[in-house]
C-alpha cells in the first residue's frame, strides 16, 4: 500500500459519530469500508460478516448487486488479509485509470483540482466532519463516509443521493474498467449508481465506449503494421 492511500479508520459499522438505525445509510459505510484498502481492521472480529448482513438487508440495491457484493466479501474472507491487500494493490495502486480520487478524473493535475479540494474540505468542516490533515478529501471511500455521516446528521437522504448522482459519470467509468478487469470490486460502483437512482446502463455505455476505443486502436495498429511492412518491402525492392 502506498503512503498516499488513506484509510477510513472507523471500521465499526454499528458505531458512528451519530447513531443511526437506517440500513440504507449504513450501506454507504459498508461500501466505503469495502472500497478502502483492506486493512487489518477489516478482517478483525466479525466486520466482514456485519457488512454482508447489512448488504443482504439493503433496500437500495437490487438482489443481483447484493449478490455480487456478497461475492466480493466472500472473496476477501477466502483470500485473507495479505492476499486481499496484494490484489487491491494490483488494481488500484497501478496508474490513474482506477484512481479512487474523484478530482483526479475531473481536473487531472491542474490548479482547478486544488481549489476543488479546498471547497470540499470547507464543506466537511462546515458539517463538523473531521479528517486527518494529510488525507485528501476527494478519496471516494472518505467521501462516502462523509455522505453517510451527513445523511444521519441532517436526515436528508435525498441530498445524499443527489450528491452521489453528481459524480455518477466517474463511478460508471470506474465500474466499467473494473468489469473489464473481471474484478468483483465493480459491484460497489454498481451499488452506488443504484443508491443514486442512476441506471446501470451508464456502465454499459462506458464499456461500449471502451470497446470502441480499443477497436480504433487495433485498427490504427494494424494500419501502422501494414505501412511498416509496405515500407520494408519497398526498401527491399529498391535495394534489389
Task: Map each language-model feature to its residues.
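Charged, alpha-helix-forming regions
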Residues: 2-240
